[in-house]
């Protein structure tokens, strides 16, 4: 830790970027993985959504920052899956809503750091929002009936929200620890 504290400001910024980049890449790599306990009715957790919520809450980002990160993550997810409907719109909405939620409710940092329940609840709600946005995109494309979209959406939204909220602490707490370490290094 002493060696890290002697790093230059540019090196610390690079370390912070490296932690962010590597954590996003790990979430992308585990996105298609289906291990025991990671699947419910054929649906897995939305790792990028979990990462975006953790990043938006912990880093206290601006609305524009969260929207741009949601856009990037959405395009990365679209590159791995079908681009229509896009995941970018849903992740932009999630990023913006998470920042607005953080700013309007001002959830105390000590509660978020020691208790996984607020993070799990936020991830649950945001997963439902994200799947609803994707369902609305399916409806706007017009190639499916509303009843078909609605019945499928209920199953997908609930399974995704349950799994994502249960797995949220696995992403949030290690990232929180790494971001705290890099933030402490930035303090003089």
List the model feature ranges, each with a label.
Residues 1-188:
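Terminal, non-globular segments
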């Amino acid at each position: 830790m002493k060696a890290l504290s002697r790093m230059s400001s540019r090196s610390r910024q690079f370390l912070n970027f490296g932690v962010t980049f590597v954590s996003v890449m790990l979430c992308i790599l585990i996105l298609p993985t289906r291990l025991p306990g990671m699947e419910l009715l054929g649906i897995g957790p939305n790792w990028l959504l979990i990462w975006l919520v953790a990043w938006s809450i912990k880093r206290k980002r601006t609305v524009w920052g969260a929207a741009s990160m949601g856009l990037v993550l959405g395009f990365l997810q679209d590159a791995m899956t079908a681009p229509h409907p896009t995941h970018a719109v849903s992740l932009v909405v999630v990023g913006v809503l998470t920042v607005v939620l953080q700013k309007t409710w001002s959830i105390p940092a000590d509660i978020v750091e020691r208790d996984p329940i607020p993070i799990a609840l936020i991830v649950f709600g945001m997963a439902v929002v994200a799947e609803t946005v994707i369902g609305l995109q399916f409806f706007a494309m017009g190639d499916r009936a509303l009843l078909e979209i609605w019945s499928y959406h209920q199953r997908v939204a609930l399974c995704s929200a349950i799994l994502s909220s249960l797995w949220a602490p696995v992403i949030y707490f290690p990232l929180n620890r790494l971001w705290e370490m890099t933030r402490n290094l930035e303090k003089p």
